[in-house]
From Swiss-Prot:
SUPFAM superfamilies: Bacterial exopeptidase dimerisation domain, Zn-dependent exopeptidases
E.C. number: 3.5.1.18
Active-site residues from the entry: 69, 134 (proton acceptor)
Protein's name in the database: Succinyl-diaminopimelate desuccinylase
Catalytic activity field: N-succinyl-(2S,6S)-2,6-diaminopimelate + H2O = (2S,6S)-2,6-diaminopimelate + succinate
Annotated NCBIfam families: dapE_proteo, PRK13009.1
Subunit structure and binding partners: Homodimer.
Keyword Hydrolase: yes
Keywords: Amino-acid biosynthesis, Cobalt, Diaminopimelate biosynthesis, Hydrolase, Lysine biosynthesis, Metal-binding, Zinc
Cofactor needs: Zn(2+); Co(2+)
Disulfide bond residue pairs: none
Length: 377
C-alpha cells in the first residue's frame, strides 16, 4: 500500500461538499473500501442524515467514530483555494474538513486496511460508527446508531473518536472526557409602560439585574482533577420594546452551562429556579440538555493511546476534558472507554482549514499502533 494512500483518500473525501447534515457519497466511498477487506456494513439513515455501522470480527470491540459532514465554508473570498478542491502547498493539505474531520477518517480507514492486511485473522472486532449529522443538530446521527446498538445489546469496549484534539503538535492533547452542556431559555415578565412614568410600569430588565449578577458570580462547584469548575455564560438578551420611550413587558435571555461531573443537570435546574424565586421574578423557563459529562478514567485504552503517542510522536500527551461537546456523550451510554485523538485544531471551522501531510500520515500510524496493541495477545 503506497505511503500516499491516506492523502489520496483524504482528498477524495474533501472534494465532496458534504455540508451538514448531507453526506453526498462520503460514506459510500468508505464502506466500499471496508467491504473489500471483509467488513459487514449497515446503513442506519434517518431523514437527511446518513449513518453507517460497519464491523469485522467478533468479541472485544474497538470502534472508530467520526463524521462525514462539515460546516459551511463561510466567506469564499477568504479562501486562498477552492474549499472543496483539496490543494497541497508546501506539505500542507488545504480544504474544508481536512482537520475536522475527513483527514482523521482517512487515517482510520487506511490504518484498519493496513492492520487487516497484516493480521487477516485478528482477534476481536473492529468497527466504524460514522454519521453525517455531527456539525448541525446531532439529532439523527450518532445518537440513533447508539440507540440501535443498545436495543440489540451490542457492546463497544473501546472507542477512538477522530475529533481534532491536538493543539500545537499532533498528539499533544487527547480527550478522555467532555463536560456536560445545558441551555436555559428564560423569559422574565414585567409591565409595559411609558418610560417617563416608571411608577406605572414594571421594568423586567431592572428587576432581573440582581438575579443575573448572582447567576454569573455563583460557585456551582469546584470541579475536580478531571474537570474544571462548572461555568455559565449568558449569550443572548432581548427585550420586547420597539420604542425608545417604552418600558418592555418582558425580557428573554439565553444562557448556557458547561458542567462537570460534580453536579447534574437536574441540580442546575433546581438551583437556577430557586434563584429566580429568591428574587421574586415572574418567569417561564425551558431547558435543553445537549449532553451530560462523561469521563474515561485511566485504563487500558488511555494507557495504550498514551504509550502509542509517546512512541511515535515522542511527546507525553495531556489528558483533557476541555472544549465543547462531542458525539462521545452518546457513545458513553454504552459504557465504553472513549478517547478522542485527532489532528491539530488551529484551523477548524476557519477559512483555509488545513493539515500538514506529515501529521496525516503520522495519525494513520498512530491509529494502526493502537489497533495492534488493543488486539495483541
Amino acid at each position: 500500500m503506497s505511503s500516499c494512500s491516506v492523502v489520496n483518500l483524504a482528498k477524495q473525501l474533501i472534494s465532496i461538499p458534504s455540508i451538514s447534515p448531507m453526506d453526498l457519497g462520503c460514506q459510500k466511498l468508505i464502506s466500499d473500501r471496508l467491504i473489500n477487506i471483509g467488513f459487514s456494513v449497515e446503513n442506519m439513515n434517518v431523514n437527511q442524515t446518513n449513518n453507517m455501522w460497519a464491523y469485522k470480527g467478533s468479541g472485544t470491540t474497538l470502534a472508530f467514530s467520526g463524521h462525514t459532514d462539515v460546516v459551511p465554508i463561510g466567506n469564499k473570498i477568504l479562501w486562498n483555494s477552492p474549499p472543496f478542491s483539496p490543494t497541497v502547498d508546501k506539505g500542507v493539505l488545504f480544504g474544508r474538513g481536512s482537520a475536522d474531520m475527513k483527514g482523521a477518517l482517512a487515517a482510520m480507514v487506511i490504518a484498519v486496511e493496513r492492520f487487516v492486511k497484516k493480521q487477516p485473522d485478528h482477534h476481536g472486532r473492529i468497527a466504524f460508527l460514522i454519521t453525517s449529522d455531527e456539525e448541525s443538530m446531532a439529532h439523527d446521527g450518532t445518537i440513533k446508531i447508539v440507540s440501535n446498538l443498545i436495543k440489540r445489546k451490542e457492546n463497544i469496549d473501546y472507542c477512538i473518536i477522530g475529533e481534532p484534539s491536538s493543539e500545537q503538535k499532533l498528539g499533544d492533547v487527547i480527550k478522555n472526557g467532555r463536560r456536560g452542556s445545558i441551555t436555559a431559555y428564560l423569559c422574565i415578565y414585567g409591565v409595559q409602560g411609558h418610560i417617563a412614568y416608571p411608577n406605572f410600569s414594571d421594568n423586567p430588565i431592572h428587576k432581573s439585574i440582581s438575579f443575573f449578577c448572582t447567576l454569573i458570580s455563583n460557585c456551582w462547584d469546584n470541579g475536580n482533577v478531571f474537570f474544571s469548575p462548572t461555568s455559565v455564560q449568558i449569550y443572548d438578551i432581548e427585550s420586547k420594546s420597539s420604542s425608545d420611550n417604552m418600558v418592555p413587558s418582558e425580557l428573554t435571555v439565553k444562557f448556557n452551562f458547561r458542567f462537570s461531573n460534580e453536579i447534574t443537570s437536574s441540580d442546575i435546574k433546581k438551583k437556577v429556579e430557586l434563584l429566580l424565586k429568591h428574587f421574586n421574578l415572574k418567569y417561564s423557563i425551558e431547558w435543553h440538555v445537549s449532553g451530560n459529562p462523561f469521563l474515561t478514567k485511566v485504563g487500558l485504552l488511555s494507557d495504550i493511546v498514551v504509550r502509542s503517542v509517546e512512541e511515535l510522536c515522542h511527546i507525553s500527551p495531556n489528558l483533557s476534558t476541555s472544549g465543547g461537546t462531542s458525539d462521545g456523550r452518546f457513545i458513553a451510554e454504552l459504557g465504553s472507554q472513549i478517547i478522542e485523538l485527532g489532528l491539530i485544531n488551529k484551523t477548524i471551522h476557519k477559512a483555509n482549514e488545513c493539515v500538514e501531510i506529515k501529521d496525516l500520515r503520522l495519525l494513520c500510524h498512530l491509529y494502526e499502533c493502537i489497533i495492534t496493541k488493543i488486539f495483541e495477545k
